[in-house]
UniProtKB/Swiss-Prot annotation:
ATP binds at S235, G236, G237, V238, D239, S240, S241. It comes from Shewanella baltica (strain OS155 / ATCC BAA-1091). The keyword Nucleus does not apply. GO terms for molecular function: ATP binding; GMP synthase activity. It is an enzyme of class 6 (ligase). Residues 8-207 form the Glutamine amidotransferase type-1 domain. GO terms for cellular component: cytosol. InterPro entries: Class_I_gatase-like, GATASE, GMP_synth_C, GMP_synth_GATase, GMP_synthase, GMPS_ATP_PPase_dom, NAD/GMP_synthase, Rossmann-like_a/b/a_fold. The active site is at C85 (nucleophile), H181, E183. This is GMP synthase [glutamine-hydrolyzing]. Keywords: ATP-binding, Glutamine amidotransferase, GMP biosynthesis, Ligase, Nucleotide-binding, Purine biosynthesis. It holds the Pfam family GMP_synt_C. Catalyzes the synthesis of GMP from XMP.
Length: 525
């Protein structure tokens, strides 16, 4: 079996919102890479032994005192280096070039760069040709400062009207700088540039692919676990499902999955999880029906954050009780993925922001004394999904819209009651079913229904009824950081509304949420 970590790229993070995207692109090319904070030590880089280094972008200004710098060793390690945006600026500054602060001359958004000379990084790449026969490339810029003088040994490779050094290269040392962002899709041939860097310039082999990752993960799990038993909290979500399948392949019946039905799941979800993993795949699953326990614990509580905490606490209590029954279990498996690891690691200098804690089994009691098994901790979400497909999990389960950890606990506004959850489940199932029928489900990023604790007058036949209100929510987004409300067709919305009001006894009014993010969040609570 080839070593999927044999060839690798190190990406140093200077705080850009696009940095994780660079890592995902390199992985898509088929090369393993890791994302570290910019302030790593020479010893750490030596130990990692990368075949190439990428200096990512960042929000700081190279001209400011105490702004981040690449470790000097990056430029003496003898491996190719690619600086992107801020990464190009700090490379230039550190190697003897000059960077000036942009005063109203920044470039943000689409730009066309003119190629001035050939470079390995841009070999065979052009989007258009200007009147002088020079190749032009469509790229995405996002910078205020710019390089005003390049270091000795470098040549200008590309320019724009306002940026004399849109790309630079020292081909002998294999140092390259680009002022634009090749990792974003708006840079039309960005993937080809990154591919040139990783495969041709750094000489990496494209070993990083789903089948090899699975093989490697199973091998490592067998080594780590040996003949021991493992316990896993299976939610039916993407991460825990893929962990379950990997462990099942590696250790078979030595895996015990605990599926806690908290009464806050989607329609028929508990039955589907048990059928798929228990009956179809033959996993060993303990099904805990804890609906009443969760609902009792939340009785009278209307505050969203308090509800989240209660749901988390009760889950931990139940999981702790069940794990004690599995006396032979020595390991706890978790669905930690690479972005969780990056967020937790932060930066030694405190430049990285602290992100909210995840609703995961992370808060388990300290006295559990179980070793931790995290087979997905090197993987991004899109990689986890691809592996899931390879392991035989159904596409519609791996690629369905995000569902919050606390489930309907945060989609029933205010106090959570069984009656509200049952109504919401049925209304939501109709909305999702109609989206699939109209071929709209995959055209929106997330769609769901929210239960509003207000009654509204309705007329049914000759009688009036005074029933509950639900809101439909559908958004379009690239990264879930910002989102637009989805402009679904009126006739479609009318059809969904009619079905819900006619088929779900207890709901008399359906509204559609037309709020973007910001200012509204995607979920209501």
């Amino acid at each position: 079996m080839s070593d999927i970590h044999e060839h690798k790229i190190l990406i140093l993070d200077f705080g850009s919102q696009y940095t994780q995207l660079i890592a995902r692109r390199i992985r898509e090319i088929g090369v393993y890479c890791e994302l570290w904070a910019w302030d790593v030590t020479e010893a750490q880089i030596r130990e990692f032994a990368p075949n190439g280094i990428i200096l990512a972008g960042g929000p700081e200004s190279v001209t400011a005192e105490n702004s981040p710098r690449a470790p000097e060793y990056v430029f003496t390690a003898g491996v190719p280096v690619l600086g992107i945006c801020y990464g190009m600026q700090t490379m230039s500054e550190q190697l003897g070039g000059k960077v000036i602060q942009g005063v109203g001359e920044g470039e943000f958004g689409y730009a066309q760069i003119e190629m001035l000379t050939d470079s390995l990084l841009f070999k065979g790449i052009e989007d258009a040709v200007n009147s002088e026969g020079k190749p032009l490339l469509d790229v995405w810029m996002s910078h205020g400062d710019k390089v005003s003088a390049i270091p000795e040994g470098f040549v200008a490779v590309a320019k724009t009207d306002t940026c004399p050094f849109a790309a630079m290269a020292n081909e002998e040392k294999q140092f390259f700088g680009v002022q634009f962002h090749p990792e974003v899709t708006h840079t039309r041939q960005g993937m080809r540039m990154l591919s040139h860097f990783a495969l041709d310039i750094c000489g990496c082999a494209a070993n990083w692919k789903p089948s090899s990752i699975i093989e490697d993960a199973i091998e490592r799990l067998k080594k780590q676990i040996g003949d021991d038993e493992v316990i896993l909290g299976l939610s039916g979500g993407v991460d825990s499902s893929v962990v379950a399948m990997l462990l099942h392949r590696a250790i078979g019946k030595k895996l015990t999955c605990v599926f806690v039905d908290n009464g806050l799941l989607r329609l028929n979800e508990a039955e589907q999880v048990m059928e798929m993993f228990g009956d179809h795949f033959g996993l060993n699953i303990i099904h805990v029906d804890a609906e009443n326990r969760f609902l009792d614990a939340m009785k009278g509580e209307a505050d969203p954050e308090a509800k989240r905490k209660i749901i988390g606490r009760v889950f931990v209590e139940i999981f702790d009780e069940e794990s004690k029954k599995c006396a032979n279990a020595k390991w706890l498996a978790q669905g930690t993925i690479y972005p969780d690891v990056i967020e937790s690691a932060g930066s030694a200098t405190g430049k990285a922001h602290v992100i909210k804690s995840h609703h995961n089994v992370g808060g388990l009691p300290d006295d559990m004394e179980l070793g931790l098994v995290e087979p997905l901790r090197e993987l991004f979400k899109d990689e986890v999904r691809k592996i899931g497909l390879e392991l035989g999990l159904p596409y519609n389960m791996l690629y369905r819209h995000p569902f919050p950890g606390p489930g309907l606990g945060v989609r029933v506004l205010g106090e959570v009651k069984k009656e509200y959850c049952d109504l919401l489940r049925r209304a939501d199932a109709i909305f999702i079913e109609e989206l699939h029928k109209a071929d709209l489900y995959n055209k929106v990023s997330q769609a769901f229904t929210v239960f509003l604790p207000v009654r509204s007058v309705g007329v049914m036949g000759d009688g009036r009824k005074y029933d509950w209100v639900v809101s439909l929510r559908a958004v379009e987004t690239v990264d879930f950081m910002t989102a637009h409300w989805a402009h679904l067709p009126y006739d479609f919305l009318g059809r969904v509304s009619n079905r819900i009001i006619n088929e779900v006894d207890g709901i008399s009014r359906v509204v559609y949420d037309i709020s973007g993010k910001p200012p509204a969040t995607i979920e209501w609570e």
